[in-house]
Amino acid sequence: MVDAAVLEKLEAGFKKLEASDSKSLLKKYLTREVFDKLKTKKTPSFGSTLLDCIQSGLENHDSGVGIYAPDAEAYTVFADLFDPIIEDYHGGFKKTDKHPPKNFGDVDTLANLDPNGEYVISTRVRCGRSMQGYPFNPCLTEAQYKEMEQKVSTTLSSLEGELKGQFYPLTGMSKEVQQKLIDDHFLFKEGDRFLQAANACRFWPSGRGIYHNDNKTFLVWCNEEDHLRIISMQPGGDLGQVYRRLVHAVNEIEKRIPFSHDDRLGFLTFCPTNLGTTLRASVHIKLPKLAADRTKLEEVAGKFNLQVRGSTGEHTEAEGGVYDISNKRRMGLTEYDAVKEMNDGILELIKIEGSL
């Protein structure tokens, strides 16, 4: 049974959300009917409740989505809420749909988006992975955090060639190293209010760490929002090179760490927006003419399934006319197709900018 205090919190939170002018997907799909059906359910292995899934969205009415999965089973137990949100966010991925098997495609077919270096400042491709046998952030114990960090650190330390580098645990990290990594945009800070409210920051900084290779083009975040965020990036627009490095890294890590995967949803992540390929391919790009009107920029980007963010990440404004633009769709298509969609869209945006 779900205890009375949790039910009370749910009821109060639901009423507030209902009365709010929140634009979140949570508000859109959490009808009274769905709410009543799910409020007394729990996931079998970890006892996660509806509150664990939606408390961030109940607290932050300005959420875009407002829901997280406390453990892998939540996607099934609370499917009546997750499925419509997934379908809405991922461009019509229906509950009868199946995410295709992993396919990184032919990495050699992607080239430099901006060979003359006029528009693209940097290129980045990342994916998220969850380690099999562990729940997501809200259910992890401190001992599990430490055990996971140990596994990740050992695995990454054995990487060779271009991926060779060093693992820095957040615990006991000197202020200087910490600040340097933040300035490099490498380090993650303790979660924002959206993640805090989702209980994703417990036992901080235990079990959290960062790895980067010697030339700072390959990064792994351990236990930030997801168990693993694997990131390949470099200055300029050479998407082919960035993607090739990511694919190589993911394949190497997967040989040593089994990842959580679901036949229908693909690779499992804490936030439903990252499911499937989990892949986000992005550029920091200057498009001064298009960007003079952000609404117009977003409209054009939307046509190519691209998402526009401010240059310092989610929930931020653009600095100096530099935008972060990425593929929006991560589900129902292969890894290669997700990157290709971003590739084609960015080339179109550059073409439009050049013609203005």
From Swiss-Prot:
Its EC number is 2.7.3.3. Substrate binds at G64, V65, G66, I67, Y68, E225, C271, E314. It comes from the Eukaryota. Keywords: ATP-binding, Kinase, Nucleotide-binding, Transferase. ATP binds at residues 122-126, 185, 229, 280-284, 309-314. The keyword Nucleotide-binding applies. It catalyses: L-arginine + ATP = N(omega)-phospho-L-arginine + ADP + H(+). GO terms for molecular function: arginine kinase activity; ATP binding; creatine kinase activity. This is Arginine kinase. It comes from Schistocerca americana (American grasshopper).
